[in-house]
Design a protein with these regions (language model features):
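C-terminal motif of bacterial Sec signal peptides marking the signal peptidase cleavage site
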Residues: 24-30
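Ligand-binding "clamshell"
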Residues: 111-123, 138, 211, 216, ...
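Short helix-initiation/N-cap motifs at beta->coil->alpha
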Residues: 80-91, 178-207
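Ligand-binding clefts/hinges and TM-proximal coupling segments of bilobed small-molecule sensing domains
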Residues: 157-182, 262-288
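A bilobed periplasmic-binding-protein/Venus flytrap-type ligand-binding module shared by bacterial periplasmic
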Residues: 130-141, 242-257
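A conserved helix-loop-strand patch within extracytoplasmic ligand-binding domains
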Residues: 123-172, 271-272
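Short, polar/charged alpha-helical segment
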Residues: 49, 57-79
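Bacterial signal peptide processing site
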Residues: 32-35
């Protein structure tokens, strides 16, 4: 009997110890969660490190050479993480593996967050290198021949954007009763040169210049591939929807970091730094 009682007592102790261990782990995890949610606030004179997701192109340089140095006095140290497509930077931001990104325009952000149920918000616009029409076969828009193959981005917002640029140049006409930010190939009402539209992942468009007659390449991928804007047959007429934006999780908009970035992006200090940088000829934010 005594042995059974001791066994039961020892069993109770083991159960209690296990429960205590689990409780401790939960408490630690909760504390860790609180720390993460506050991680974008400045920290009593210490430097807060921020990882910004970027895609190939100029915006990683913009973060490292202009935005980062200007935020140093606010207590933030920015570094970039490179992604090779437009999908992963927003997913990484939503998951918390990065704290911000700079790689997309507002039309793309709005559509992607809606389609993927993400809670991300723009802090403001940055100077943006527009989409260009590139060709190794033709020297001008007027040279484009009947039946030419034209590559454009496959993702919804950039596909619509590319069709809009083709329409700006008189190469196609879109249906009049559609939302131009959601246009698809099926919304082409008139295609007088019988262009063959080929949709590709945006990251492949710069390489496609070698294999198609004409390619519409977003500015960041054109920059990364060494395609110069001056060599484009034409560039898009930018509006607010296609100006790139600096993005964070919505919960971080009012953090110290969110407030500092939002203030910086419309400041004379930022405008002056851009004017002296490699980005001086980019399309300017509509907020300037």
């Amino acid at each position: 009997m005594t042995i059974n009682i001791l066994k039961k007592a020892n069993g109770v102790k083991r159960v209690f110890a296990a429960v205590l261990a689990v409780t401790t782990l939960v408490s630690v995890a909760a504390c860790g969660s609180d720390s993460t949610s506050a991680s974008l606030d400045s920290n009593s004179g210490k430097t807060t490190k921020i990882t910004v997701g970027v895609c190939p192109g100029p915006y990683g340089d913009m973060v490292e050479k202009v935005i980062g140095p200007l935020l140093k006095d606010d207590g933030f140290e920015l570094k970039t993480k490179l992604f090779n497509d437009y999908v992963q930077p927003d997913k990484a931001l939503a998951s918390g593996s990065i704290q911000a990104n700079l790689m997309q325009h507002i039309n793309y952000l709005n559509k992607f967050t809606k389609d993927n149920n993400l809670d991300l918000t723009s802090l403001g616009q940055v100077p943006t290198l527009g989409l260009g029409i590139y060709s190794k076969k033709y020297q001008s828009i007027d040279d484009i021949e009947d039946g030419s193959t034209v590559s454009i981005a496959a993702d919804g917002s950039n596909l619509a954007r590319s069709l809009g640029v083709l329409e700006q140049q008189g190469l196609v006409t879109l249906k009049g009763d559609i939302d131009s930010t959601k246009a698809s190939v099926n919304d082409i009402a008139s295609n007088p040169k019988n262009l063959k539209i080929k949709t590709l992942d945006a990251a492949q468009l710069a390489r496609s210049v070698d294999t198609v007659d004409v390619a519409l390449v977003p500015g960041n991928f054109a920059w990364a591939a060494g395609l110069k804007p001056a060599e484009a047959l034409a560039t898009e007429q930018q509006d607010e929807g296609v100006i790139n934006v600096f993005v964070v999780n919505t919960k971080d908009v009012d953090s110290d970091f969110g407030k500092a970035v939002k203030k910086l992006l419309t400041s004379q200090e930022f405008k002056g730094a851009i004017a002296k940088s490699d980005f001086k000829d980019f399309g300017k934010p509509t907020t300037w």
